[in-house]
A protein has these predicted regions:
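Conserved glycine-rich cofactor-binding loop
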Residues: 8-9
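Conserved glycine-rich Rossmann-like NAD(P)H-binding loop of the short-chain dehydrogenase/reductase
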Residues: 24-38
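Conserved NAD(P)H cofactor-binding loop of Rossmann-fold oxidoreductase domains
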Residues: 81-87
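Substrate-binding pocket helix/loop in short-chain dehydrogenase/reductase
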Residues: 89-90, 94-102
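Active-site helix of classical SDR
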Residues: 113, 148
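Residue(s) in the substrate-gating loop at a strand-loop-helix junction
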Residues: 132
């Protein structure tokens, strides 16, 4: 079983299509039931039969717990794609929007990882946390966005130390700019014509997650060309 959060759009939706094409058993989640239904509508009847859908707000601990309580056995992989963007000069940013940015990106990651570790730290589960290249370098007019992504990176790297000796693996993913609906709600007017598509990023990520007997990719940066 593969669990994909943030599956209602962007990379999460693209990953859903990629894994569904391979007849994988999936549990997909996002905030919007309507958007999740739209993702499912793009799949064949046979692909849909392998997928469970659960709308959830991952900023709420109870809903995170309810999501994973649906599973009768530990998942093989959890891909946490949920998040949002918000950009602009710091002095012009709205305090409420900043709080929402922190909640959507950092709080959700903390609550999801907390739930996964409490349930599955003694199981062979690959936990993939999708961040951004904004977690690797500062960017003008992206100060708060970079801040929350750096915080998630710190969370992942610290938790790896706590999980030393555990069969659970944390995999950090840093994708560059993708041409998705992400930008329309971010407050940043940007030309995405040269950005990679979500499908391109999903293919690269899916391929990178194929482990061998003695090795796996622990950190992956997906740069746009």
């Amino acid at each position: 079983m593969i669990v994909i959060t943030g599956a209602s759009s962007g990379l999460g939706a693209a990953l859903t299509q990629q894994y569904a094409a391979d007849a994988c058993q999936l549990l997909i989640s996002g905030r919007s039931e309507q958007k999740l239904a739209a993702v499912m509508a793009k799949l064949s009847t046979a692909e849909q039969a392998n997928i469970s859908v659960q709308a959830a707000d991952l900023c709420v601990a109870e809903e995170v717990s309810q999501l994973f309580s649906q599973l009768s056995a530990p998942p093989t992989t959890v891909i946490h794609c949920a998040g949002s963007g918000y950009f602009g000069p710091l002095e012009q940013q709205n305090p409420q929007a900043i709080e929402q940015l922190i909640s959507n990106n950092l709080t959700s990651s903390i609550l999801v990882l907390r739930e996964l570790v409490s349930r599955y730290r003694d199981h062979k589960v690959n936990v993939v946390v999708v961040m951004s290249t904004a977690a690797q370098a500062g960017k003008a007019n992206e100060s708060t966005y970079c801040a929350v992504k750096w915080a998630v990176k710190g969370l992942v790297e610290s938790l790896r130390l706590e999980l030393k000796g555990s069969p659970m693996k944390l995999i950090a993913v840093y994708p560059g700019g993708m041409a998705t609906d992400f930008w329309s709600t971010s407050g940043k007017d940007i030309d995405t014509s040269s950005f990679m598509t979500a499908d391109e990023a999903a293919i690269m990520l899916k391929n990178a997650l194929v482990a061998t007997q003695h090795g796996y990719v622990s950190d992956l940066t997906i740069n746009r060309g």
